[in-house]
């Protein structure tokens, strides 16, 4: 069982969406992840939102002209995503078993994004497998972008993966670190409790 399901019980979609809607109404910028991804690949590029949740990032990217596919294991989150953007392709799948061909999806993405603490919330011991699956979905030269917390101040659960461990998973999957930032606004990484990492296949 994933740490996410242990945390939420798999019934979190509406609550999660409501929380972000409230933040948006308060004036908070809700599109940093999409803006960051858009700075890396041009409009029209194929983007996989791995752990897409309610679709906040993917819907924004689609509106910016990207060809997007969303994958998540949480049915309640996907229900919200499908309601908000029924025209977009949303798939329910475990990232540790993700096989694009089985879903009728070409494995030639220009960018795979895993926002929202995806890696710390995976089922224990599946991190390397998930990186391998996501790397395999990239075209040569494609980018894996992952942002996640590294300490309890930035996570709803105890930390479960360090940056060296994540980088080792990426290296094993044939990915090379390109850059690392402290925020989705591309602030330089300062060794703090949150990191956005960019690896290239």
Where are these regions (language model features)?
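Conserved beta-strand signature within the Rossmann-like core of class I S-adenosyl-L-methionine
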Residues: 141-149
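Conserved class I S-adenosyl-L-methionine
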Residues: 1-53
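A short acidic, Gly/Pro-enriched loop at the edge of an enzyme's catalytic core
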Residues: 101-111
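A short SAM/SAH-binding and catalytic strip from SAM-dependent methyltransferases
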Residues: 110-125
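Short alpha-helix
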Residues: 159-174, 180
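Class I SAM-dependent methyltransferase SAM/SAH-binding core
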Residues: 54-99
């Amino acid at each position: 069982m994933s740490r996410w399901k242990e945390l939420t019980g798999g019934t979190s979609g509406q609550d999660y969406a409501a929380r972000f809607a409230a933040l948006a109404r308060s004036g908070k910028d809700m599109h940093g992840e999409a803006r960051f991804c858009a700075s890396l690949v041009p409009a029209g590029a194929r983007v996989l939102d791995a752990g897409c949740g309610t679709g906040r990032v993917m819907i924004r990217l689609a509106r910016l002209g990207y060809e997007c596919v969303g994958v998540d294991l949480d049915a309640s989150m996907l229900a919200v995503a499908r309601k908000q953007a029924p025209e977009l392709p949303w798939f329910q799948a475990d990232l540790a078993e993700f096989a694009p061909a089985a879903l009728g999806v070409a494995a030639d993405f220009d960018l795979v994004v895993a926002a929202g603490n995806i890696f710390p919330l995976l089922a224990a011991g599946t991190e390397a497998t998930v990186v391998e699956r996501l790397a395999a979905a990239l075209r040569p030269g494609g980018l894996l972008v992952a942002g996640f917390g590294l300490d309890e101040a930035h996570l709803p659960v105890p930390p479960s993966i360090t940056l060296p461990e994540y980088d080792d998973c990426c290296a094993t999957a044939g990915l090379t670190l390109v850059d690392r930032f402290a925020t989705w606004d591309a602030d330089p990484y300062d060794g703090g409790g949150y990191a956005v990492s960019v690896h290239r296949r």
